[in-house]
Amino acid sequence: MKRPLSNKIDEVKNKISFGMPGHKGKEFFDLDVKRDLTEIYGTDNLLNPSGVIEDLHREISKLFGSKESFITTNGSTGALHIAMAMATRPGDKVLIQRNTHKSIYNGLLLNDLDPIYLNTIYDKDRAMYFGIDLDELREKIETNNIAACVLVSPNYFGGILRLREIIEILHEKDIPVIVDEAHGAHLYFSDLKKYSALDAGADLVINSTHKMIPSLTQAALIHRGTDRFSHEDLLKYVNIYNTTSPSYLVMLSIEAGLDYMDREGRSELIKRCKDMEGLKDAINYDLDLSHESIVANDPMKFLFRIPGMTGEEVVEDFIINKDIRLEMGDLYYALGIISPINTSREIEELKEAILSYEDGEYKKIIPQDFPIPDKKLLPREAFLSHGERISYKDAKGRISKEIIGAYPPGVPLVSFGEVISEEIINKIDEFLAEGIEVIGLLEDEIEVVK
C-alpha cells in the first residue's frame, strides 16, 4: 500500500509553525504508544469519571475558575454539540452569529433548532469581522422567544467580544449563554483573562486546548460557568455526543499542556507578546484591528499583508520558500498563530521573511455585502428533504439543502432552508471570477429541495 498522507506530512513537519496545533510540532509530553490505553482497572472512565480523570477535572476547574470542567476528545465541535443539546429542545429558537463556525450550524441540524441570526459587524473597507450590535441583540431577544444564545469569542482573527455587556443583556431575559471560546484557552493564563467567557459569566464555555496551547489535535474542554446546568445534565449529554473510545493520549496531552501553562506558560506568553511588539515595530505594522464592538484583540493572532499578493499566495510562498507554516490566507490577509511554545528565534525568522518582500501596493479590497436570505424551512427539515442537484445559475427561488458560502471569509451566502435569490447567484459569479472558493458548490451545481 502507498502512504501518500505520511509522505506529505513528512515534507512539512519540520517547518517553523505559526499555525495550529499549539504544540508547534515540539515534544511537550511523553507521546509513548504504551500510554495509549483504554478504561482498564485504575485508569478511570471519561464517560463516568470517579477516579483519576475526576481528579484531573478538578485540577482543570481550579485553573479556569469554572464550576466544573470536563475533557472532550471530539474537539470543540463535539463540545459545542453537547452544550447546544443541554440548552435547547427540538424546535427552539436559538440566537447565533451569522459568521459562526460550521459546527454550530451542524448543531442546528442535530437538535432541530430554529436559528435567529445576529449580524456580525463587517467592515467592508478592511474586509474584517468584528463584534455584534447591542441594539440588534436587544431587538432580537425582544421579538423572539429565544431558548439559548451561542456566541464566538475570540473569533478566528483574535477579536474579543464585549462579553460582560452581552451576557448581562441575555441573562436579564433568563437566556442561557454558550460561548464558543475555542480560540481562547490561553486567555486564562494572561492579562486578557478579565475578558474571558468564564469571567464574564457565561453558562457554558468551550475551549480547544489544541489551538492556542500545547495539546494534541481534538483536545477540548467544556466548562460549566454557572449552576444553570447541573453535573448530571453535562454527564448525560457527554455520554451521547462524546466517543466511547476517548484517546488517553489526547487526555494526557491536555493534562501536560495545562501543567506547562500553569508552570511556564504565563511567563512565556509575556515574552511572546514582547517578541511580537518588536516584530511589528520592525515591519512598520499599520493594520488597524480596532472596533468599538470588540473589547480587545488577542496579540497571539498575527494578521498581516504582503504587497501585491493575496493571503493565499503568501501562505504558499512561505511554506515553499521560507520554510514557515502559516495558519491560513484569504483574498487579502495571511494569519499567523503564535503560542507560548514558539521561540523568540522563530519570531525573528518570521520578521525576516516578511522584510524579504519588496514594498509596493496592496491588493485592492473589494467591498462585499452578505445579506441574510429569507428562511422557508428549518435547517433540519431542509437537510432531510428530498433534493436534487442543479446548476447554481438556475437556482433562483429554490430552497437550499446545504450551506453555500465564499471562503474566504466563510460566511454563508445561504444556509439550510433559505431561499436562493438572484443576488446570491450574482454573488457566486463574482466570487468565482475573483478566484474565491465557494463551499457547497460541486463544479457548478448545488443541492436544493426537490
Task: State what each model feature region is.
Residues M1-G51, I175:
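N-terminal "arm"/small-domain region of PLP-dependent enzymes with the aminotransferase-like
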Residues F70, I116-L118, E327:
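General small-molecule cofactor/ligand-binding pocket signal
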Residues E437-K450:
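Charge-dense polyanion-binding interfaces
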Residues N284-F416, E422-I439:
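Conserved C-terminal alpha-helix-loop-beta "cap" of PLP-dependent enzymes
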Residues K2-K8, E27-F29, S76-L289, I306:
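Conserved PLP-enzyme active-site core in the AAT-like
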Residues V33, L37-G75, N99:
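Conserved N-terminal alpha-helix of the aminotransferase class I/II PLP-enzyme fold
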Residues F70-T72, C149-V152, I337:
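Short glycine-rich or small-residue beta-strand-to-loop segments that form or flank ligand, phosphate
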